Amino acid sequence: MMALPADLPKKMAPHLLVQLRPMLEDDLATVVATEQAAYGHPWTLGNFRDALKAGYAAYRLDAGEQLVGYLVAMKVIDEVHLLNITVAPAFQRQGWAACLMQALSLWAKAQGAVCLWLEVRESNERALKLYKVFGFQQVGLRKDYYPASRTARESAVVMSKPLHT
C-alpha cells in the first residue's frame, strides 16, 4: 500500500475523504477518460491494462467520489521508474501532483529503491519545474521519443533522483 503525505493540498475541503488506493481494472474507464482529458497523446486503455497485468505499482488518488489523479511506476531491482503521473484537469495547480510525487517517494523508499527515474516531454515546463523541485536532475535526452503530431516527434528529458533513507 502507498501512504499519503501528511501535507495534503490546503485548498481541499476538509470534510472530503482523501485516499490513495491501488488502481483496479474496474477503475480504468474513469482513468482513461481522465488521461484523454489531460493529454494530447494519452495512454490507451491497453497501456493501463498492460501495466496492471505486469504488476506495476498503479495507484489512484481520490477526494470524496472524484478521481483527482493517479500514477503508474515500475520497480526494477533497486530503482523505480515513474511511467505515468496525471492530475485531472479540474484539480491541476492545486498541489496534487506534489502529493502524488511525495507518495511515490515514500513508496519507493519502502520498496528499497535507491533512486527514481522518469522521462518527460521536453515541452512540459510545468512538469519539469515540479520534478526539479523534488530533486530530480536531467541525466539524458531521448531524441524523438514522443509523438508530437502525425509527422513530428518530441524529445524526452530523462531525469533521476537519488533516494536518501
Predicted segment positions?
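ABC family nucleotide-binding domain
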Residues: F91, W96, L130-K132, R153-V157
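Short glycine/proline-centered loop/turn elements that form peptide/ligand docking sites
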Residues: M101, N124-A127, D144-R150
